[in-house]
From Swiss-Prot:
NCBIfam families named in the record: hemL (TIGR00713), PRK00062.1 (NF000818)
Chief localisation class: cytoplasm
MF terms (GO), sorted A to Z: glutamate-1-semialdehyde 2,1-aminomutase activity; pyridoxal phosphate binding; transaminase activity
Annotated EC: 5.4.3.8
Catalytic activity: (S)-4-amino-5-oxopentanoate = 5-aminolevulinate
GO CC annotations on file: cytoplasm
Entry's localization field: Cytoplasm
PROSITE patterns per UniProt: AA_TRANSFER_CLASS_3 (PS00600)
SUPFAM superfamilies, alphabetized: PLP-dependent transferases
Protein name, entry field: Glutamate-1-semialdehyde 2,1-aminomutase
Family: Belongs to the class-III pyridoxal-phosphate-dependent aminotransferase family. HemL subfamily.
Enzyme class: isomerase
C-alpha cells in the first residue's frame, strides 16, 4: 500500500481554497473512497506522486495521452513554440490553417472546422450552430452520454419527466430542460418516438458513438445507420461527439470505424496533446453560419493559441506517420484476454466492453449496452478493485463509470504486470 502522507496534507489544504479540493469532481475519489493522489511527474506510461510512489497509468489524463506522457517529439515542438513564437496573440496565425487543413483530411465529416479551448466549448458551440442553422430549439441526447458541463447536457428529460424537463444540476433552468430530450442509447425506437412527439422541433441529435463516461459502451453500427437515416428524413443535424473516441478508436475516429458520417463532429483531448483544446466542424453549408460569415456567434480569447495547436498538430503528425492503431489493438486485446482468463480461473463472469484502446471492466454479469444496464454494476466491488490495483502500482480511473485507456507506450512487460495485478484485485474485490 503506497504511503500518501503528502497527498493527504495537500488535499486538506486544497479543501480550504478549492471547492471539494479539486477542479473536476471525479478527482476527489468520492466514488471509490480514500485520499486523492497528487501527481508530481509523468513520463511515458508512468506517473509519480508527491510521496514518491510510481504508478502505471491507464487514465492518460482522461484520454489525451495516446502517445504517453512527455513524448519527446511533442515536448520538443511545444518548447520550440514557447521559446520562438509565443503563447498567444489574439490574431490569426498560420498554424491554425495547417491544423484545420489536416483535420479536414483526416476526419470524414469535416469540410470546415473551428478551434476552441475545450470539449465542452465544442459541444456547446455545435448545438448552438445546429439550432441556428435549422431554426429549431430542441435537441436529443442519450442517457449516459457525457457532452461536457454545458446547461443543455445536464438534463435528464426522459421517462416520466419527458414533457416537463428535469435538470440534473441546480442552476439549469426549466426552460433549458424543456429543450433537451433524453433517448435510450442503442434504441432507435426510443429516438423515433421522441422525434414524432416533437415533430418539426428537433434541431439536433448529439451522441457519443462510443460512450466513454458510463464505462465504455459502443454504439451498434445499425443504430448509428438508423440515426443517420432518421436525421436525413426529418431535417435534423446529426452530431457525433468524438471528444474522447476521436483519433483513438481509429485515426478518423468512430465515424471512420463505423462508416457513418455525421453532419457535425466535436473533438478534443488527443488533438491537444495534453493541452486545453477543442474543435468542432462538419459540412460547409452548416459551418458557414458561424460568425463572421453567418449570424451564429462563437468566439474565444485563446482559441487557436500557438501552444495548444502545436501540441495537437505534432500529435496528429505522429499518429499519421507511426500508425499506432494495430499495436494499440494488440495491446488492448491482450489485456482483455488476460482479464477474461483471470475471471475464468476465479469463476467470475463480469462484463468487459472494449473498442480499440478504450475499455471498461463492469462489475456486473449483465450485458452492458446502455445507461440502465451499466448502472447494474457493483460500484462497491469496483472500489475494492480500484484500491487493490492502486496498491499494486496500477492507476485506474477512480470511478466504475470511466474508461481505461491503453497507450502506445505501454510495454508488454507493463501489460503482463497489469494482468497479474488484475487477478489479485479481482480476488480482493470479491472477498
Amino acid at each position: 500500500m503506497p504511503v500518501l502522507t503528502r497527498s493527504a496534507e495537500l488535499f486538506e489544504k486544497a479543501k480550504k481554497f478549492i471547492p471539494g479540493g479539486v477542479n473536476s469532481p471525479v478527482r476527489a475519489f468520492k466514488s471509490v473512497g480514500g485520499t486523492p493522489i497528487y501527481m508530481a511527474k509523468g513520463q511515458g506510461a508512468y506517473m509519480t506522486d508527491v510521496d514518491g510512489n510510481t504508478y502505471l497509468d491507464y487514465v492518460g489524463s482522461w484520454g489525451p495521452f495516446i502517445l504517453g506522457s512527455m513524448h519527446p517529439r511533442l515536448t520538443a515542438a511545444i518548447e520550440y513554440t514557447l521559446r520562438n513564437i509565443g503563447t498567444s496573440f489574439g490574431t490569426p496565425i498560420e498554424i491554425e490553417i495547417e491544423i484545420a487543413e489536416l483535420l479536414c483530411q483526416i476526419v470524414p465529416s469535416l469540410e470546415m472546422v473551428r478551434m476552441v479551448n475545450s470539449g465542452t466549448e465544442a459541444t456547446m458551440s455545435a448545438v448552438r450552430l445546429a439550432r441556428g442553422y435549422t431554426g429549431k430549439d430542441k435537441i436529443i441526447k442519450f442517457e449516459g452520454c457525457y457532452h461536457g458541463h454545458g446547461d443543455s447536457f445536464l438534463i435528464k428529460a426522459g421517462s416520466g419527466v419527458l414533457t416537463l424537463g428535469d435538470p440534473d444540476s441546480p442552476g439549469v433552468t426549466k426552460g433549458t430542460a424543456n429543450d433537451t430530450l433524453n433517448a435510450t442509447y442503442n434504441d432507435i425506437e426510443s429516438v423515433k418516438a421522441i422525434v414524432n412527439e416533437n415533430k418539426g422541433q428537433v434541431a439536433a441529435i448529439i451522441i457519443e458513438p462510443v460512450a466513454g463516461n458510463t464505462g465504455v459502451i459502443p454504439a451498434k453500427k445499425e443504430f448509428l445507420v438508423a440515426l443517420r437515416e432518421l436525421c436525413d428524413a426529418e431535417g435534423i443535424v446529426l452530431i457525433f461527439d468524438e471528444v474522447m473516441c476521436g483519433f483513438r478508436v481509429a485515426l478518423g475516429g468512430a465515424q471512420e470505424l463505423y462508416g457513418v458520417t455525421p453532419d457535425l463532429t466535436t473533438m478534443g483531448k488527443i488533438i491537444g496533446g495534453g493541452l486545453p483544446v477543442g474543435a468542432f466542424g462538419g459540412k460547409r453549408k452548416i459551418m458557414e453560419n458561424i460568425a463572421p460569415l453567418g449570424s451564429v456567434y462563437q468566439a474565444g480569447t485563446l482559441s487557436g493559441n500557438p501552444l495548444a495547436l502545436t501540441a495537437g498538430l505534432e500529435t496528429l503528425k505522429i499518429l499519421m506517420e507511426e500508425n499506432p492503431y494495430p499495436e494499440l489493438e494488440r495491446k488492448a486485446a491482450f489485456l482483455e484476454a488476460g482479464f477474461k482468463d483471470n475471471m475464468n480461473k476465479l469463476g467470475l463472469n463480469y462484463t468487459q466492453n472494449r473498442v480499440g484502446s478504450m475499455a471498461c471492466l463492469f462489475f456486473t454479469e449483465n450485458e452492458v449496452y446502455d445507461y440502465n444496464s451499466a448502472i447494474t454494476a457493483d460500484t462497491a466491488k469496483y472500489g475494492k478493485y480500484f484500491h487493490s490495483m492502486l496498491d499494486q502500482g496500477i492507476y485506474l480511473a477512480p470511478s466504475q463509470f470511466e474508461a481505461m485507456f491503453t497507450s502506445f507506450v505501454h510495454t508488454d512487460e507493463d501489460l503482463e504486470k497489469t494482468v497479474k495485478a488484475n487477478y489479485n484485485a479481482l480476488v480482493a474485490a470479491t472477498k
